[in-house]
Amino acid sequence: MTQDERREYLIQYLLKEEIPFGRQNIPTDRQGQENLLRSLMNVRPPRPISNDFLKIQDEYLTERNIERGITDVDTLAPVKSDSRLYIWQGDITTLKCDAIVNACNSQMLGCFSPMHACIDNFIHTYAGMELRLKMHEIMAKQGHEEETGKAKITSGYNLPTKYILHTVGPIIQWKVTKEDEDLLASCYTECLKLAADTGVESIAFCCLSTGVFRFPQQRAAEIAT
């Protein structure tokens, strides 16, 4: 199958799952099809899916992620003050390293808003549907929503990274409290503990809680370091 054929197969499969979606016209241009496929993947609940679909999805995403560009962490230069620390600005889903960190909500199932620009959406989109299925399995076994400041680990699936660490940061309601600061610090330490237990040697953190969770960026950076 060509990449175009894979994309069209995946779209047709997902549209046929839901009758309302099935009546939607499929765009003829590549960008329109990519946006539609991403949207369909974003909104799909964590229910069983065929092995044939997953095989073609994995082939599609493997090539798609190569097309998007991959940055190997080994090619980056550390900061002058600490040879273990790197500062990099870019799309974390394109990093080739041992682990990347995902900023999640307490359901831990990824972002269900079509085409949303959050990191949770990007990671689930380019990792593939196996990630949502795995997180559903983990959370069903846990039996309750994820606590703030804790972390889980999964495979990276179709991403260049080996693993994904999932953590829930504090949500700031009015002003930052000591508890908020402690919980944010816990996100980092819990991820590092899981990474060490798994043998991870390189880990890429995104900014935690500084987006829609409203943690002030300067203070969050101080806590992270």
Segment roles from a protein language model:
Residues 1-225:
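Macrodomain-like recognition of ADP-ribose-binding/processing modules
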